[in-house]
């Protein structure tokens, strides 16, 4: 008999083996096997015509035209998990043959298809597999297998591998584990099915890894790519979720991964690592708190037959890391060595920014943890009194990297080093690294004597090189500052900034040596705050190899990461690339940005609007003008001063009044953070009231988005909890924004009852969640190697209070639900507002809009920006069950306008975390490019034709999504700006193009496409980004000015014309706004940077607050350098507020003089470059202040005989990077 099979790829090998054995046994069968990895094609149909039977085992999503197949062969049997697809009386039994599986059942199925009566062999659906033997009961296994090791590890793997004879990965893992541990390898069918006597994965965990309701393993390796599901508790019949099951085990759950689509060679050379696998092999399991997705297997494919094969070196890595975790668990607390890594924003000044952590007081957080460790019995001594004392101790000892004001000689003299690593010791380790890694490091940095520039952090002792590893020791607790990663020496310029001209720049010798030292001396490493550089070092996106720098540096040491619960994009990168277990922390309390100094002015304005009496209105005009003069609203003050000189204050009052009202309304409609969060501390008193009030206001906004009280949060709940819709938040039915909300919150917290019972219940619920937050307790559980419960992440200011309680190992969302329906609708509004504003200002449609598409759009806003991109193109998503399953082109007559072209600079995190979203947008672009429409109504097609005429291929002409090179993160421009390594806009354009001209899409990944990028940028009419929350703004990170600013500058330079820059605002999705970039810079300056309320909040945090202020001012300078959109009054007011103001200057000098130096230096540079035009008096005063600061810093060297060479405050414009750029193939 001749049979053609169309099978799931994973069944093809076992089926072939069965058929070949039958032939050897004399059975007359001929066969052809096709894998469902490929759709049914003409070759299959031709074969079907010549065979006796066509057998199809399909999935519910396979696109199979059964009627078409029957035209070639009517004898077709279809089998599927869904009985609705069965078409034959034989389908049911064939399904059982396949489901029970194994060689015997596949042989019997073939014989059954040939007309022989064969029974299904009923193999168990769960059990313990060990050394070729299956045990269905735990007791039987424990009696038969001797446990002679100290620790026990469980493995949970899919029965599918066992019955399909695809066990290479499992066997290799088991063999390696056997050398170190007792092992309990459990196989499970996954889903519970009583008809098959299949318990399901969750119940299998309870059956085989617990005895007498107590765990018998120290760690679990979960190789499943689907949730454990829920089981019924036998005691009370309640359902127990997968997370509750793992909490019963209370051990770390490791999740090594396999590539289901790539061979070993493909994976090894692929810069992406994994791609299509990410959603279901990594993202979904993270919902149950699994950790460390290290790849251990790939799929080899030969003639359509697939087998999984283990990667022994990666398996070895997994086992070594598990061993370190278990050893940590059993080590006495008094002997455990803990190392805290504080981050450092080197480009924004090493000395000014120690302890960088978004919205977290990292120093006080570490002190709180150290004190708790001591209480718990850890050996911790000489704990500083508070966080400020810790910060000052680090700076007094200079336990940091070299920079403009810090030399190695100073570090050594002041005792800021932990260890001096001998050259021999370092090279013994260095020589164990892969050959191409060593070569790249040596090519970039040379040996320990340096290359082009002296090697960083090297101290010579008796003529021998010693690598200086900095930090402070407090008994068995170490506090270290993360080393610099892309530059070296006591300078910051275009010569030492190697990363400026090399996105693949490896970390320095000292960086690698430091992490090697951390691995050797400590039992666990804890990175403090969002975020550092480790997880962003070059390497694969996910599924890293031993040639990827995060994998090299983290080594085998257990890794906990204190991370802001509002930042899932970057936190998820840390989980997947540096094997971090996240302990998330609460977000900052957000308060109304309106401040006391404006209240009298506001009351006059309110009175003026109501007053009808002309004389009183005239009097109020005087009062308003005088009151403005008392504020820091410099822009209005300057206008008033000019008009007063002309004697026309009353004639021009309406113009002043309208602008003043707009400014005050803008401040009223904004919030600012009240200082920073301190890890382990809960907001109390007034802060607790403000915190809950801001959450309730956000719930009101989200539940009423697009006139739907429930849609937004319901959709987010399903995206955040796929398969668990009831785990999300119930909607809150507000009918209006309550003006008395603050009092009501306060009353409930003080035990009073209020009339609105639903609101009262909600306040109590949020308050209870806050109280349950036990951040330090969770961290201590992590150090004890226990299970850290997972939880959702995102913005509280978007109503997502399900992120409470904090102290959890957060997860992201289901990427295939993006954009949600409500997010797409917001995107439509945003697109319409932007187009209409441009139409009003320019009188024509924009042909090409260049956008900065950040991962926060997906993680915080469910893809509003992505929805906007699709709608600009005239495309909409097609949904099935809440998931995006395709795209539909909107007809031109329905769209009512031309299709707008888009040029997208996507963030590296979006590229790596959401490849499906990248591919979907690229598919939309391709669809539009291929439409048969007039060029004047389809700007995508118009620009494709233009590029074809310039000699580009069709695919190159459709490249619209660009990013940095694969495995790298950054934009290039920020390095040039911070290092002062630029002379004109052309230089910044060159840096941007060099770093960002790599195309991404459905069939292209990181293809260098400079011509395509430059050509499409020449057609750009405007650039765009958006704000979704007041927690983060365009001064909040250097990526904003580096990418959006860099994009704007590049478009302007290449086009040779003005390119407008706009900013969208979806903080309130019911009231979407579009502003110019200049207006957004003004808004953020007034509501935060120059806001006395915000400044006082920062000042409460001493050194850390001063550093954060300086960083934001550096980004103001960055925006001015890249776009020239910062008005003079903003620089003037920065000078007045932070340098000229005696009280604030004193604060900086006492707490962080380096932050003050950085502020003053950037102001001087802005003036020297013509970015800031101000009075000679201001400049003279600034120069005097700077000389005083310089003198104060230099006094700190007085006790050091030989300080060595350092740059200090000079601005040295070194353009050697451009020569390197050209030699690197610009």
Swiss-Prot record:
Signal sequence coordinates: none
Protein name: Uncharacterized protein MJ1441
Regions annotated as coiled coil: none
Family according to the record: Belongs to the Mg-chelatase subunit H family.
Upper classification of the organism: Archaea, Methanobacteriati, Methanobacteriota, Methanomada group, Methanococci
UniProt xrefs under InterPro entries: CobN/Mg_chltase (IPR003672)
Single Gene Ontology BP annotation: biosynthetic process
Organism in which the protein naturally occurs: Methanocaldococcus jannaschii (strain ATCC 43067 / DSM 2661 / JAL-1 / JCM 10045 / NBRC 100440)
């Amino acid at each position: 008999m001749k049979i053609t099979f169309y099978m799931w790829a994973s069944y093809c090998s076992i089926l072939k083996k069965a058929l070949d054995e039958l032939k050897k046994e004399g059975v007359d069968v001929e066969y052809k096997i096709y894998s469902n990895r490929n759709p049914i094609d003409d070759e299959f149909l031709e074969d079907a015509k010549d065979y006796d039977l066509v057998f199809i085992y399909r999935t519910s999503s396979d696109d199979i035209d059964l009627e078409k197949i029957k035209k070639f062969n009517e004898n077709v049997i279809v089998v599927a998990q869904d009985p609705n697809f069965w078409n034959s009386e034989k389908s049911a039994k064939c399904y059982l043959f396949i489901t029970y599986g194994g060689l015997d059942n596949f042989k019997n199925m073939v014989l059954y298809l040939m007309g022989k009566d064969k029974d299904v062999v009923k193999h168990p659906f769960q059990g313990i597999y060990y050394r070729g033997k299956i045990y269905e009961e735990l007791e039987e296994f424990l009696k038969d297998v001797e446990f002679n090791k100290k620790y026990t590890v469980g493995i949970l793997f899919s029965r599918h591998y066992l019955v399909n004879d695809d066990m290479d990965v499992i066997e290799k893992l088991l063999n390696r584990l056997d050398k170190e541990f007792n092992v309990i390898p459990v196989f499970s069918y996954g889903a519970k099915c009583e008809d098959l006597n299949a318990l399901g994965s969750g119940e299998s965990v309870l059956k085989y890894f617990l005895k007498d309701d107590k765990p018998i393993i120290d760690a679990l390796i979960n190789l499943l790519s689907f949730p454990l599901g829920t089981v019924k508790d036998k005691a009370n019949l309640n359902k127990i979720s997968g997370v509750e099951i793992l909490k019963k085990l209370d051990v770390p759950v490791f999740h090594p991964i396999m590539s289901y689509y790539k061979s070993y060679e493909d994976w090894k050379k692929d810069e992406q690592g994994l791609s299509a696998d990410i959603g279901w092999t990594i993202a979904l399991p993270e919902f149950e708190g699994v950790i460390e997705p290290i790849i251990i297997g790939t799929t080899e494919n030969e003639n359509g037959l697939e087998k999984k094969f283990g990667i022994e070196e990666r398996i070895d890595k997994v086992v070594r890391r598990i061993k370190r975790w278990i050893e940590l668990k059993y080590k006495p607390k008094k002997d455990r060595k803990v190392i805290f890594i504080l981050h450092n924003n080197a480009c924004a000044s090493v000395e000014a920014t120690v302890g960088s952590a978004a919205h977290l007081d990292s120093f006080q957080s570490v002190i709180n943890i150290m004190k708790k460790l001591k209480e718990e019995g850890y050996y911790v001594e000489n704990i500083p009194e508070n966080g400020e004392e810790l910060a000052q101790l680090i700076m007094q000892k200079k336990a940091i990297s070299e920079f403009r004001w810090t030399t190695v000689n100073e570090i050594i003299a002041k005792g800021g080093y932990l260890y001096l690593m001998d050259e021999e010791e370092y090279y013994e380790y260095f020589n164990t690294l892969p050959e191409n890694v060593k070569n790249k490091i040596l090519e970039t940095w040379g040996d320990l004597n340096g290359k082009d520039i002296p090697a960083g952090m090297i101290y010579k002792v008796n003529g021998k090189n010693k690598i200086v590893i900095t930090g402070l020791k407090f008994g068995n607790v170490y506090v270290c500052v993360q080393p610099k990663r892309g530059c070296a020496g006591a300078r910051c310029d275009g010569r030492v900034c190697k990363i400026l001209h090399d996105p693949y720049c490896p970390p320095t010798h000292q960086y690698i040596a430091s992490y090697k030292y951390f691995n050797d001396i400590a039992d666990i490493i804890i990175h403090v705050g969002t975020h550092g550089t480790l997880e962003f070092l070059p390497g694969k996106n996910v599924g890293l190899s031993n040639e990827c720098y995060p994998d090299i540096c983290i080594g085998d040491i257990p890794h906990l990461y204190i991370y802001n619960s509002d930042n899932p994009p970057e936190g998820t990168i840390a989980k997947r690339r540096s094997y971090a277990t996240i302990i998330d922390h609460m977000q900052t309390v957000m308060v109304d940005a309106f401040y006391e100094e404006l209240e009298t002015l506001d009351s006059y304005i309110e009175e003026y609007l109501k007053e009808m009496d002309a004389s009183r209105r005239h009097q109020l005009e005087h009062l308003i003008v005088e009151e403005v003069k008392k504020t820091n609203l410099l822009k209005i003050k300057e206008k008033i001063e000019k008009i007063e000189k002309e004697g026309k204050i009353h004639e021009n009052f309406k113009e002043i009044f309208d602008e003043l009202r707009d400014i005050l309304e803008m401040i009223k409609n904004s919030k600012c953070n009240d200082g920073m969060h301190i890890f382990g501390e809960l907001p109390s008193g007034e802060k607790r009231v403000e915190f809950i009030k801001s959450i309730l206001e956000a719930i009101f906004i989200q539940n009423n988005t697009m006139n739907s009280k429930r849609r937004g949060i319901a959709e987010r709940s399903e995206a955040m909890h796929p398969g668990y819709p009831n785990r999300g938040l119930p909607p809150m039915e507000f009918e209006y924004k309550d003006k008395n909300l603050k009092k009501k919150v306060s009353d409930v917290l003080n035990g009073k009852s209020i009339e609105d019972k639903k609101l009262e219940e909600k306040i109590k619920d949020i308050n209870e969640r806050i109280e349950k937050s036990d951040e330090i307790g969770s961290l201590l559980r992590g150090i004890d190697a226990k299970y850290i419960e997972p939880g959702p992440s995102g913005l509280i200011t978007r109503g997502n209070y399900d992120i409470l309680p904090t102290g959890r190992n957060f997860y992201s969302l289901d990427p295939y639900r993006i954009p949600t329906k409500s997010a797409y609708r917001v995107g439509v509004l945003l697109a319409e507002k932007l187009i209409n504003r441009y139409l009003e200002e320019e009188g024509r449609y924009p042909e090409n809009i260049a956008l900065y598409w950040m991962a926060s759009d997906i993680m915080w806003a469910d893809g509003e920006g992505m929805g906007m991109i699709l709608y600009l193109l005239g495309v909409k998503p097609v949904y099935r069950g809440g998931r995006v399953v395709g795209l539909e082109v909107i007809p031109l007559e329905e769209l009512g306008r031309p299709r707008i072209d888009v040029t997208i600079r996507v963030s590296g995190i979006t590229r790596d975390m959401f490849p499906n979203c990248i591919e979907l947008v690229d598919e939309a672009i391709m669809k539009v490019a291929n439409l048969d429409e007039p060029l004047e109504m389809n700007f995508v097609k118009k620009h494709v034709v233009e590029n074809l005429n310039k000699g580009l291929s069709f695919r190159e002409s459709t490249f619209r999504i660009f990013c940095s090179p694969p495995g790298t993160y950054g934009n290039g421009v920020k390095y040039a700006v911070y290092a002062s390594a630029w002379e004109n806009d052309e230089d910044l354009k060159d840096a941007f193009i060099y770093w960002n001209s790599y195309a991404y899409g459905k069939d292209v990944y990181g293809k260098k496409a400079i011509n395509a990028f430059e050509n499409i940028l020449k057609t750009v009419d405007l650039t765009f980004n958006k704000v979704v929350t007041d927690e983060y703004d365009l001064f909040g990170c250097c990526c904003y000015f580096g990418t959006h600013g860099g994009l704007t500058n590049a478009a302007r330079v290449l086009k040779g014309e003005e390119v407008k820059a706009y900013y969208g605002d979806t903080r309130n999705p019911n009231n979407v706004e579009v502003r110019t970039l200049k207006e957004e810079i003004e808004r953020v300056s007034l509501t935060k940077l120059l806001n006395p309320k915000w400044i006082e909040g920062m000042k409460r945090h001493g050194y850390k607050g001063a550093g954060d202020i300086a960083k934001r001012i550096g980004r103001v300078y960055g925006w001015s350098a890249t776009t020239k959109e910062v008005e003079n009054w903003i620089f003037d007011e920065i000078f007045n507020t932070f340098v000229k103001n005696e009280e604030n200057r004193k604060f900086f000098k006492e707490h962080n003089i380096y932050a003050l130096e950085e502020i003053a230096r950037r102001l001087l540079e802005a003036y020297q470059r013509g970015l800031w035009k101000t009075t000679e008096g201001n400049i003279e005063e600034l120069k005097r202040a700077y000389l005083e600061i310089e003198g104060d810093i230099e006094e700190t060297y007085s006790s050091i005989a030989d300080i060595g060479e350092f740059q200090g405050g000079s601005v040295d414009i070194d353009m050697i990077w451009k020569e390197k750029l050209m030699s690197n193939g610009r």
